[in-house]
Amino acid sequence: MKNNIVSKLLNLLENEGSNIQYGNENVTQLEHALQCAELAEQNNFSKEIITAALLHDIGHLLYDGKDPIHDGKDGYHENLGAEYLSTYYGEEVTRPIKAHVACKRYLSAVEEGYYEILSEASKISLEAQGGPFTKEEAEEFINQPFMKEAVELRRFDDQAKV
């Protein structure tokens, strides 16, 4: 069963992801996914985090029709992707995926200079996603399971746009 889903996901990335731009960035969804996974591997993360890095934006490819983010709306692709993958993967994969958008909100709130390194497209999507967390939201967020891994995934996500 796992081999079937892996083949299905890789086909989705290759067939759909190679034809869809990653937001307003200069890479396709496929290029972005591969770059994220490569960064996780280069930094010696677990196979679960490498898998999460590869599949973290799969929700963008699961919409019927146009992804709402192209209209400046948050389509909650992270929830869609994590829910879809939860049948096949455990929380060590799906929780970082579900949290990677919120991690941008978290890092914008707690890390000086983080907002300034974001691309213009990422700054626009941050606003569509609710903007930076409050101090209280940030504290509550980071204490949940797998959030430290999710923050690392977010860092790969931010870098994988070349």
Predicted feature residues:
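Metal-dependent phosphohydrolase cores
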Residues: 1-162
